[in-house]
Structures are given as C-alpha cells and as structure tokens.
Regions:
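Gram-negative bacterial Sec-dependent N-terminal signal peptides
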Residues: 1-23
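A residue-level marker of the well-folded mature domains of exported/periplasmic proteins
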Residues: 3-4, 21-292
C-alpha cells in the first residue's frame, strides 16, 4: 500500500511539473480574423519565431467578433499562458479583454491595432498615419493635385482605420486633392466591391481610389473593371494578392507592411518580458511604397 501511495504521489508530482512546464513555455496570439491574408502572414511570422525560441504558441481566431475575442482571452488566462499577443477586433472593445488579462497578471502585447484602455506592455505596428499620407502623396504625384479621389475605410473603431484615414487626409489637404467620398468597407474584399460599385455610380468622374487595405482595393478593382472605367487604385498592406495585382497593373501601388515581422517581433518582445528584460512601449515597423 505504501508503495502504491508513493507511486501515485510521484505520478501526481510528475503531472503537476509537466503542467507547470507547459504553462511556463506557452504564449498565445489572438488575431482579429484569419479570413484575411495579412493576419495569416502575421500568424506565420509568430509561429516561426516561437519555434525558434522554443515556445508553444496557441493561435486563436476572434472572427472579427469582440465577444469571441473576450472569450478567447478568458480561455487563455484559465489555461495559464504566460503572455498574450493580441491583434484587436476594435480598439475600444478589446479593452475588456486586456483588463481581464491584466487581472490575471498576464502581460499583453498589441499587434497592428492599438487598444484605447487597459495596460499594454508594448505595441508593435507600422506607422499607419505615415502610410496613409504616403498613399495620398502617391496619388497626387501620379494623377496630379486636385485629383478627384475616393477613400475606402476599414473597420470603424480600429486604430489602423483611424490612423490611415488621418494620414490620407493630411495628404488630401496638403496636395489639394478633391475627396468625393469616404466610406467604410470593413477591410473586406466583397464589401470593397459592393461599396465601390455604389460609389462609382454616384461619382462617375472619380480618378483615383485609396483603399485602407489590399482586400478592399482588390474588391474595388473588380468594381472598376465591371464598370469599364479607368481609375487608379492604391491599396495598403502589401499582401501576396496585393503585390500580384500591382505586378499585373490592376493596382497602381500598395503601401507595404511586414505582417510576418510584426508577428515575429511580438514573440520576441514576449520572450524579453518573460526573461526580465525591458522593452519599448511602441515599436514601429517600416513601410514602403510598392508600385508598377
């Protein structure tokens, strides 16, 4: 009987140590959606870096739903992850999820989109304001000042949409562009197509379009082609599909981000935090214009 108790105790101790080790080595990335190639690239970059550094990485998809995002973070705190990388569905709505992680003493790193509330150790993103301005300057350089333009906006409430729009409006004012319309299409290709169809009907003299991501830009391409018009379209992100569209001449340009680098940096920063290092509050990732 004593031997049996010893064996059970040893097994329980071994199990406890295994769970503790697993928790110690586990971090997570929560993405707003995996139905977008940009965030798939971000996931791939995080997974590659986690493998290099020896971490078990949990990947969760919030499906563009703040309630799903909150549920994901709650699940991760219960599972005992040591750090959470989060790409918010919405900069305000994510605050509840971040505060939940804060209460559980789990460090949070935001990727691409910021959070308006809650304690975030570090934010990693492109300079979206600069990128929006780069897009406007590109249009002015190619089409000319006073060009008639339309903007397709991303998801309202996200820092990326707000900041890209802010940068684009700087160029609109600086370069005297004539903004005919600016309407959300939620970073979605199908919505980009539908919104662009309506805007083309209302603004047949449009000369250029700035879409706040490549998915909306590609939707706009289809709408313009179907209408038999020639309109210059500039996207944002530098996704594989976006870059191919530039090479084919369907997009005039894309403001290229490096989502894989953003994901990898997130894991790097988590590693530094968990090893007692200090990190910068904001970490910018360079942008560049890719054009034909």
């Amino acid at each position: 009987m004593k031997k049996l108790v010893t064996l059970i105790s040893t097994a329980l101790l071994s199990s406890t140590m295994s769970i503790a080790a697993q928790a110690q080595d586990t971090i997570a990335i929560v993405l707003s959606t995996l139905n977008n190639p940009f965030f798939v690239s971000m996931k791939d970059g995080a997974e590659a870096k986690a493998k290099d550094l020896g971490y078990n990485l949990i990947v969760l998809d919030s499906q563009n739903d703040p309630s799903k995002e909150l549920s994901n973070v709650e699940d991760l705190t219960v599972r005992g992850v040591k750090a959470i990388l989060i790409n918010p569905t919405d900069s305000d709505a994510v605050s509840n999820a971040i505060r939940m992680a804060n209460r559980a003493k789990v460090p949070v790193i935001t990727l691409d989109r910021g959070a308006n509330h809650g304690e975030v150790v570090s934010h990693i993103a492109s300079d979206n304001v600069a990128g929006g301005e780069m897009a406007g300057d590109f249009i002015a350089d190619r089409v000319g000042e006073n060009a008639k333009v339309i903007q397709l906006e991303g998801i309202a409430g996200t820092s990326a949409a707000r900041e890209r729009g802010e940068g684009f409006m700087k160029a609109v004012e600086k370069r005297h562009l004539n903004l005919l319309a600016s309407q959300p299409a939620d970073f979605d290709r199908t919505k980009g197509l539908n919104v662009m169809e309506n805007l083309l009907a209302a603004n047949p003299d449009v000369q250029a379009v700035f879409a706040q991501n490549d998915e909306m830009a590609l939707g706009a391409v289809r709408a313009v082609q179907a209408a038999g018009k020639k309109v210059m379209i500039v996207g944002f992100d530098g996704t594989d599909d976006g870059m191919k569209a530039v090479l084919r001449g369907q997009l005039a340009a894309t403001i290229a981000q490096q989502p894989d680098v953003i994901g990898a940096l997130g894991v790097d920063i988590a590693d530094k935090i968990l090893n007692g290092g200090t990190v910068n509050k904001n970490i910018p990732v360079p942008l560049k214009v890719i054009s034909n």
